[in-house]
From Swiss-Prot:
The active site is at 105 (proton acceptor). Keywords: Isomerase. This is Ribose-5-phosphate isomerase A. It is an enzyme of class 5 (isomerase). One of its GO terms (biological process) is pentose-phosphate shunt, non-oxidative branch. GO terms for molecular function: ribose-5-phosphate isomerase activity. Belongs to the ribose 5-phosphate isomerase family. SUPFAM superfamilies: D-ribose-5-phosphate isomerase (RpiA), lid domain, NagB/RpiA/CoA transferase-like. Homodimer. Catalyzes the reversible conversion of ribose-5-phosphate to ribulose 5-phosphate. Pathway: Carbohydrate degradation; pentose phosphate pathway; D-ribose 5-phosphate from D-ribulose 5-phosphate (non-oxidative stage): step 1/1. InterPro entries: NagB/RpiA_transferase-like (IPR037171), Ribose-5P_isomerase (IPR050262), Ribose5P_isomerase_typA_subgr (IPR020672), Ribose5P_isomerase_type_A (IPR004788). Its EC number is 5.3.1.6.
Length: 231
């Protein structure tokens, strides 16, 4: 079973949690896109749902495949969000944002009664940090913000490069018009403390540490999908 097949297995298992009439948060990234494709098949067969996308990319795919969409302002309280992750640990702390949609993903997840994470087994880690941590920043004062993050990292005993994410024609811009610094901190021993400290830096819009948001992770491997519950 290759990586895409494992993503599809996880998405199939997540789809079993979707019920008729649900208001769904729909994530961003390659695994979430497999879920959208499967969801679209169910919608075509008569399933009634309304989705809130976490990115313009996800919105375009949903429109293309016929998944009904609303804005979060129209549906401010959601039943369930299904999204992928770049890393997930044993208590369902996550690193997200590899697809560049971390701010909207976190807003949508927080507006949901439940969040289910879907991923292949390569995303499960003992300690967060091997995947660079995305930090979304305001373009204004970006150098000052970067210095503040570097000082915070040093105080926290973290080292590693901060890399400005780029696209084909320059700096990567999020759907909200922000920049992303990818922080290669390595092992993050206290994710909660780092999350709190990052939130105190004025130029930091959001970060990719998702803590106390996911209630279930569906992890796919060669033997099929397994469930990880929040503890």
């Amino acid at each position: 079973m290759d990586a895409r097949q494992m993503k599809i297995k996880a998405a199939e298992a997540a789809l079993s949690h979707v019920q008729d009439g649900m208001r769904l948060g729909i994530g961003t990234g390659s695994t979430a896109e497999e879920f959208v494709r499967l969801l679209a098949e169910k919608v075509a067969a008569g399933l009634k749902v309304e989705g809130v996308p976490t990115s313009e990319r996800t919105a375009r795919l949903c429109v293309e495949l016929g998944v009904p969409l609303k804005s979060l302002d129209e549906l401010p309280e959601l039943d369930l969000t299904i999204d992928g992750a770049d890393e997930v640990d044993h208590v369902l702390r996550l690193v997200k944002g590899g697809g560049g949609a971390l701010l909207r993903e976190k807003i949508v997840a927080a507006a949901s009664g439940r969040m289910i994470v879907i991923a292949d087994q390569s995303k499960v880690v003992e300690t967060l940090g091997a995947f660079p941590l995305p930090i979304e920043i305001n373009p204004f004062g970006q150098v000052a913000t970067r210095i503040a993050i570097e000082k915070l990292a040093a105080r926290s005993g973290l080292s590693g490069e901060l890399t400005m994410r780029s696209s084909g024609d320059g700096a990567f811009m999020t759907d909200g018009g922000h920049l992303i610094l990818d922080a290669s901190f390595g092992r993050i021993p206290d994710a909660e403390a780092l999350a709190r400290e990052l939130n105190t830096i004025p130029g930091v819009v959001e970060h990719g540490l998702f803590i106390n948001l996911a209630s279930l992770a569906i992890i796919a491997g060669p033997e099929g999908a397994r469930m990880m519950q929040a503890v």
